[in-house]
Amino acid sequence: MARKKRTMPAAEVYEKSDSFGQLPSAPPISPHRMDHIYPDSYGSPPPLHQAYHVQPARANYVPDQIARFNVIKPDRLAKRHNPQLYTKRGCTDVFCCFLFFVFLCGWVVVASLGIMWGDPQRLIYPTDSEFRRCGVDQGGYYNFRYLQFFQIFTNKDIFSKRPYLFYFDLTKCISYATALGGCQTTQICVEECPSQYFSYLQLRTASAAEIQNKMKNVVYCTDDVDKSTVTTFVALQSLVQRGKCVSYTVKSVPVLQRCFPEAIFNAVDNVNTVLNSSNSLDYLKRTFGDDALIPQDIQITGQSSEVMKSVVEDQPVTHKVIHDLSQTWWQTLILIFAAGMLSFIWTVIMRLLGSLLIWLSIFLVLGALGFGAGFSWIKWNNLKATGAIDDYSFHPAFDAYFEMPTTWFVVAIATSVLLVIFLLVILFIRQRISIACALISESSKAIGSMMSTLVFPLFPFLLHIGVFALWGSIAIWLASSGQEICRMKETNGQVYNTSTKCDCNAKLAGCTYVGIEKESDTIFWLQVYNLFAFFWLSCFVTALGDIALAGAFASYYWARDKRHDVPTFPVIRALNRAMRYNLGSIAFGSLIIAIVKIIRVMLEYIDHKLGKSENKAVKWFLMCLKCCFWCLEMFFKFLTKNAYIMIAIYGKNFFSSAKDSFLLITRNIVRTVVVHKVAGILLFLGKAMITLGMGILSFYYFSGRWVVEGVPKVDLYYYFVPIVIVVIGSYFMADLFFDVYEMAVDTTFICFLEDSEQNDGSLERPYFMSQKLLEILGTKNEIPLHTK
């Protein structure tokens, strides 16, 4: 709506001629600045349409110090075109925000169902053959149904005192993975793992008192066996043959609350000593007789003595790794911290020498192509001169093909063509490369002026950890969900699927635990919902971090005076602005990525289900779909990232921002490709050099090749353990810094494109870009403004 004409003080009116009373025409309408607010006050911007456009007074017309009215200086006029300061903002994509809230409520319901139906102890604690959890006092009669009645009340925590799972026949579950998943042998919960080698044949000639002593301290039996009644070898042999008592034991150690032979994980004694002393089953078999129920030592270990020596020595590998970490933790932290400092220094180097590094990389590529082409032509000419012939039949020696002139002729042609193409491309886009160098330099300045941007990524990183923990916890609860089923024994002592159900918590004789009954389809779809929630929230957290950083870097770009106009705590301000107005848009963009991710997971699931299918057409179709959706995900990530930058600048909804950013990029596609490739080269060089450098440094230090005076030398079992940790930590630190740098480059680039398209350097629409960028573009502002 047009505003009423009002009389303006003469001190504020400035026309291009010496007479005054004439007002300049309104500036061209910007599709973005149509939303700007122009309050009716002298310190605020004037309306865009059908209103007087106020210009700053000339310095020689009304001096600032004696001006009666508020004189609009060039800097103040420029601030009026800052989209972050004078853009009308409101809540965007409210429906998506509401949908996101409803979805989170649904996730809470899924978590509640998992907690109500599940029991993670089923996955954490081992279970015996009766599906009783070792180390846990479950309650319920089926835990103690074979015990005397008084034991139920006097030893209620009996299974909490039996934390370890013992396997009767180790040869049936010697595989570690099989042991974790269960094996086809009797398993019972015990107070401690066997501490000696034993064969029941040792008791062939033993007295009743000796048998009673062994039954009490050495022999393991199921709970339904009354050991006090076993006084003869014949009775013990009958129990062993029926699988009620163990036929042998080996010296074992607990690993993940399961008893495994010490010979596998901790060969305390020399292998030859073990195999030739009383501490072996072979010795017991030679001494007390052979039995099919008692395996050989080699069957127990599953490996020969030579392999055992090479794999296991004085201590378990885990103990050695823990020892190494305890000895080197502070050196490791120092090296990782040094990697962070190097990452920061690299950002400074990119600010000072970014252009040099870029052009140096370009000239190195040109030099390599030129050298390759020249060498190939010389080699081809020499081979032709010596009369070499071409013979491309099969040759076992691959080098023979490089003694044929045609091979070098093809290589020479290829490298020459690549050299010409690369040279022409460089000549064509040389100005755009200069723009990319200047933008990278500006991004480095922005990071240097706002050091909080380097610390901020820790906030979304912690949120990512929280989201992952929530997803993992809910997934575990859902995976462990199910109803415990107990049934009464039949008269023959067996339990069938048709047997009468009974209450597992009831103290009923004959009530037997038979397993867990699950609603497989329901749990499957709840897991899908949980996984989709993980994808959506992860993308949401990433988007929130991106839009906060984009807002901070945009505030730096659009600030006329970089020292005074950049707001205090720019990242926190941008984050607050995003959470106040743009949560719906963030939810919308992250929803798109999450949908594509879940589709890719479903395609992988279908491919896994059809893994044994011989239908080539179906497999090819699935492969094409997976490839297409991967490309689609990459495209949407690129699109949403630029949309978040536009949202941070103008505060529009997601669709409008995505459309504006996409059209802006397509109008400047060559600049976009060049900037992204050039920035990618610099970031790759930075990550590679920092990670490789810290890896080499840690190798020389932890391997003892580099001795530092005053620092004690460390003796390690596996010096590669701290090296791997340093390399991973260094890459993480470099990635943390360079992700911020990448966002700074992308935001600065979008702001630069907007600035170059919407402004023309006039008094009405001055450029906000740096003087270096203005020189590259060959333009300037009519009145130089503060750009420091």
Curated annotation (Swiss-Prot):
The protein's GO terms of the molecular function aspect are: transmembrane transporter activity
Predominant subcellular localization, coarse grouping? membrane
Gene Ontology cellular component list: membrane
What membrane topology was assigned to this protein in its record?
Multi-pass membrane protein
User: Where do glycans attach?
Assistant: 276, 497
Biological process annotations from GO: transmembrane transport
Q: List, alphabetically, the InterPro entries matched.
A: Choline_transptr-like
As for family, the record states:
Belongs to the CTL (choline transporter-like) family.
Output this protein's name: Choline transporter-like protein 1
Origin species, per record, is Caenorhabditis briggsae
